[in-house]
């Protein structure tokens, strides 16, 4: 339906969507909620301007939800696709939201290297579908861009793994990483993060349907290990 109306509800927002951008799904609202709760906690603890980075932002759904629900936060969104970035820019402008949009590879130091080691929260809904999987939802299969769907590699985890590496550089010690994945990838993505040896408190959280959907990890401090 969103592809017909050009509008997609997301938490309290109504986003403009169209050709070339992934339409956000309900499970991603939960991911945004985790980031919002974490940013809110930081504000309550006295952090003046929590720094949140949304990698692979697409329509800017997560970034906008955070910026509008935690106005004290500084939110930076990164998107590689020119088409998706145009939709993100349109949504940010229409809502007059305080979100900085950066165009480029979310896994590249050249795009966000100035933020290394100072970010409080990194959140991402990257492409993660395995190459041989066909999306069950026909709207996804027929309308959403392949670039936003398929995570590359034999298991679809090549891009999520690269995002996790980038997040480990961006986050300050003790910073929080949140990332969506396919329900069949729960154990695999946890193993990936444990193998990177940059994370502690690595665990997976289920979506509202009880399926593994979001990996959560804390950037290790010096001397900590997973």
Please name every model-derived segment:
Residues 1-71, 75-87, 103, 216:
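SAM-dependent Rossmann-like transferase core, predominantly class I methyltransferases
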Residues 72-74, 78-224:
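S-adenosylmethionine
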Residues 41-48, 113-115, 224-225:
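Intrinsically disordered, low-complexity terminal tails and inter-domain linkers enriched
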């Amino acid at each position: 339906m969103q592809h017909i109306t050009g509008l997609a509800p997301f938490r309290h927002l109504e986003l403009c969507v169209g050709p070339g951008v992934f339409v956000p799904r309900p499970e991603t609202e939960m991911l945004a909620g985790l980031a919002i709760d974490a940013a809110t906690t930081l504000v309550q603890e006295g952090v003046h301007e929590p720094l949140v980075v949304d990698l692979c932002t697409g329509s800017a759904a997560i970034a906008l939800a955070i910026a509008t629900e935690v106005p004290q936060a500084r939110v930076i969104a990164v998107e590689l696709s020119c088409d998706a970035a145009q939709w993100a820019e349109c949504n940010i402008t229409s809502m007059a939201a305080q979100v900085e949009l950066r165009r480029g590879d979310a896994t590249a130091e050249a795009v966000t290297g100035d933020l290394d080691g100072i970010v409080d929260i990194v959140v991402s809904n990257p492409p993660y579908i395995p190459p041989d999987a066909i999306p069950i939802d026909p709207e996804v299969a027929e309308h959403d861009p392949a670039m936003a769907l398929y995570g590359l590699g034999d298991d679809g985890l090549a891009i999520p793994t690269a995002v996790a590496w980038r997040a480990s550089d961006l986050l300050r010690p003790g910073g929080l990483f949140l990332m969506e994945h396919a329900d069949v990838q729960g154990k695999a993505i946890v193993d990936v993060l444990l193998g990177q040896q940059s994370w502690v408190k690595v665990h997976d959280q289920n979506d509202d349907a009880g399926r593994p959907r979001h990996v959560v990890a804390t950037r290790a401090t010096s001397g900590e290990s997973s």
